[in-house]
UniProtKB/Swiss-Prot annotation:
It comes from the Bacteria. Residues 1-15 form the signal peptide. This is Curli production assembly/transport component CsgG. Keywords: Cell membrane, Lipoprotein, Membrane, Palmitate, Signal. It comes from Escherichia coli (strain K12). A lipid is attached at residue 16 (N-palmitoyl cysteine). The keyword S-adenosyl-L-methionine does not apply. GO terms for cellular component: cell outer membrane; curli secretion complex; outer membrane-bounded periplasmic space; plasma membrane. Coiled coil: none annotated. The lineage of its organism: Bacteria, Pseudomonadati, Pseudomonadota, Gammaproteobacteria, Enterobacterales. One of its GO terms (biological process) is curli assembly. A lipid is attached at residue 16 (S-diacylglycerol cysteine). One of its GO terms (molecular function) is identical protein binding.
Length: 277
């Protein structure tokens, strides 16, 4: 009877845990947070604004902890591409290629050279137009990455049978600012942050069920929120704040003035700075 009880207990503990994947997942579009849904459902502007983004730098100086790697950075280095995507998806801005500007200029030189010597392809016979200049620039950087901001857990064990769970919160912070190309004036600036959740669940048994017979078993899993998705969410939130702030300060306007009370705009307008925990 005692052996049966132990066996049932182990099965119950293991039943609460997810089974390991049996095959690799198929390629899919990147999952997105609630901030992306808010970004893509903003009310329409009076007109889209040409914007350029050059480089969003990682100013944290943080590297992944040992034993992962001493040379891999703790945060993704793709913040520029994320910001360009967020600006375009908002339907408020028309991003202009600036990160790969040298590649674009080289390609235009090749086309012009082919046009001059008469070997140009049919699709490039029309003279090239001048590149479009931006009305504003969006600058910024990843200004902070703090690991183990908060951690904790809970567990219980009875006669060698038990389970426990632990969690850890990291935090990433981003600064975005809008710059007037004509004057260099910083029109708007915002700091946003996003927590990164990691947790672990374990269960096990360590019990002598008979003389010289030991029952031992462990099951568990860990889940780490991708830093890439958290950075993307922080950038999307920052773009929404910049749009909202620009509306309030008259930098740009809505196509329909009545939509100033749009649910998304109101939510972010009333979002206050959280107190220190």
């Amino acid at each position: 009877m005692q052996r049966l009880f132990l066996l049932v207990a182990v099965m119950l503990l293991s039943g609460c845990l997810t089974a390991p994947p049996k095959e690799a997942a198929r390629p899919t579009l990147m999952p997105r947070a609630q901030s992306y849904k808010d970004l893509t459902h903003l009310p329409a502007p009076t007109g889209k604004i040409f914007v350029s983004v050059y480089n969003i730098q990682d100013e944290t100086g943080q590297f992944k902890p040992y034993p992962a790697s001493n040379f891999s950075t703790a945060v993704p280095q793709s913040a520029t591409a994320m910001l360009v995507t967020a600006l375009k998806d908002s339907r408020w801005f028309i991003p202009l290629e600036r990160q790969g500007l040298q590649n674009l200029l080289n390609e235009r030189k090749i086309i012009r050279a082919a046009q001059e010597n008469g070997t140009v392809a049919i699709n490039n016979r029309i003279p090239l137009q001048s590149l479009t200049a931006a009305n504003i620039m969006v600058e910024g950087s990843i200004i902070g990455y703090e690991s183990n901001v908060k951690s904790g857990g809970v567990g219980a064990r009875y006669f060698g049978i038990g389970a426990d769970t632990q969690y850890q919160l990291d935090q990433i912070a981003v600064n975005l600012r809008v710059v007037n190309v004509s004057t260099g004036e910083i029109l708007s600036s915002v700091n946003t942050s996003k927590t990164i959740l990691s947790y672990e669940v374990q269960a096990g048994v360590f019990r002598f069920i008979d003389y010289q017979r030991l029952l031992e078993g462990e099951v568990g899993y860990t889940s780490n929120e991708p830093v890439m998705l958290c950075l993307m969410s922080a950038i999307e939130t920052g773009v929404i704040f910049l749009i909202n702030d620009g509306i309030d300060r008259g930098l740009w306007d809505l196509q329909n003035k009545a939509e100033r009370q749009n649910d998304i705009l109101v939510k972010y307008r009333h979002m206050s700075v959280p107190p220190e925990s």
